[in-house]
Curated annotation (Swiss-Prot):
<keyword id="KW-1133">Transmembrane helix</keyword>
<dbReference type="Pfam" id="PF04787">
    <property type="entry name" value="Pox_H7"/>
</dbReference>
<comment type="function">
    <text>Contributes to the formation of crescents and immature virions (IV).</text>
</comment>
<feature type="transmembrane region" description="Helical">
    <location>
        <begin position="10"/>
        <end position="32"/>
    </location>
</feature>
<keyword id="KW-0426">Late protein</keyword>
<keyword id="KW-0472">Membrane</keyword>
<protein>
    <recommendedName>
        <fullName>Late protein H7 homolog</fullName>
    </recommendedName>
</protein>
<dbReference type="InterPro" id="IPR006872">
    <property type="entry name" value="Poxvirus_H7"/>
</dbReference>
<keyword id="KW-0812">Transmembrane</keyword>
<dbReference type="GO" id="GO:0016020">
    <property type="term" value="C:membrane"/>
</dbReference>
<comment type="similarity">
    <text>Belongs to the chordopoxvirinae H7 family.</text>
</comment>
Length: 146
């Protein structure tokens, strides 16, 4: 399965800055009924720990345009508490995905927009995103415009 363009467009426009890789995993499980093939421990450009999820041809972080660096061995020890916390969250989400979505307002809103927004509107938002990025316009401005 390829990365879903509608979902990426919504994540990068109307929901920019609101979602995490855990949220993306939950959305993929809810919308596409797919579980991740692999879990990757990573850090972002600021050195903050983040869990990433690998699917067939993409990672959850790609929906958010995040560049994450995988960590191994001793680096994992440094982030042990964050790893435990995020793995526990992932397990809770996987245990009852429907309940998790129901109790998370931004994910409920995302799914509603994903299901109800027309392809034309999402395509228009994606086009705005491409133009804005080419001109160097900030994501926050794009989010407000969509």
């Amino acid at each position: 399965m390829e990365m879903d363009k509608r979902m990426k467009s919504l994540a990068m426009t109307a929901f920019f800055g609101e979602l995490s890789t855990l949220d993306i995993m939950a959305l993929i499980m809810s919308i596409f009924k797919r579980h991740p093939n692999n879990t990757i421990f990573s850090v972002d450009k600021d050195g903050q720990f983040m869990i990433d999820f690998e699917y067939d041809n993409y990672k959850a972080s790609q929906y958010l345009d995040l560049t994450l660096t995988p960590i191994f061995g001793d680096e994992c020890k440094t982030h042990a508490s964050s790893i435990a916390e995020q793995l526990a969250c992932a397990d809770i989400i996987k245990e009852d995905i429907s309940e998790y979505i129901k109790t998370t307002p931004r994910l409920k809103r995302f799914i509603k927009k994903y299901r109800n927004r027309s392809d034309t509107r999402i395509s228009r938002d994606t086009e705005k995103l491409k133009i804005a990025l080419a001109k160097g316009i900030d994501y926050e401005y794009i989010k407000d415009a969509c």
